[in-house]
């Protein structure tokens, strides 16, 4: 396993366990304590973990970590969610991609489509799209660059979305609350609101760790969401509550025929 893959796996392990020792991680990943300590130093510098005496815990104070760090968490689940999301795209579609780490996983899969129009405020997504060989039109809104999310925000960005109507919006989230709706830690969330208003269909992409979480800022109500793509870890009662709100819940790996 490559170091970056192992570091992503360590974060996923900590998501489940909360805290653990170096020895436990070394045994789980079949490697040495020295190797694990090197990984933990890198993750600590990234702000995603806090090292303790002989062990490590997730850094829960880092409520809105940089996009490069988010991509390391629940990577496999995000890839499966992205694969499911792409199945709802067709040649000729116009789509919005938000700047989330789950949505970012969609980009390599877009190479199969031609004559699609993609608007995004994410610099990472634009760079990745430019590497594809398919026929596409890429639109960016402009605005003020936010380094933490590698994306553009502000009034200029919001105004840009008001001038277009798109077929679909693919959007991630930091938390889904049955009462509050789709929420985020991102303090410059109003551009996400503008994206919702510009799309005929809102497709929410979230792994099951996001359910029941309520972040400070509300992007939209659940009534605004048409589809939710998630993994099999969703609580059945939570799924039923979402479906009662009219949301089509798609579970990765589950037949939806």
UniProtKB/Swiss-Prot annotation:
It holds the Pfam family DeoRC. Residues 3-58 form the HTH deoR-type domain. Keywords: DNA-binding, Phosphotransferase system, Repressor, Transcription, Transcription regulation. GO terms for molecular function: cis-regulatory region sequence-specific DNA binding; ligand-modulated transcription factor activity. Induction: By glucitol. SMART domains: DeoRC, HTH_DEOR. GO terms for biological process: negative regulation of DNA-templated transcription; phosphoenolpyruvate-dependent sugar phosphotransferase system; regulation of DNA-templated transcription. Residues 20-39 bind DNA. SUPFAM superfamilies: NagB/RpiA/CoA transferase-like, Winged helix' DNA-binding domain. InterPro entries: Carb_Metab_HTH_regulators (IPR050313), DeoR-like_C (IPR014036), DeoR_HTH (IPR001034), NagB/RpiA_transferase-like (IPR037171), Tscrpt_reg_HTH_DeoR_CS (IPR018356), WH-like_DNA-bd_sf (IPR036388), WH_DNA-bd_sf (IPR036390). NCBIfam families: PRK10434.1. This is Glucitol operon repressor. The gene is srlR.
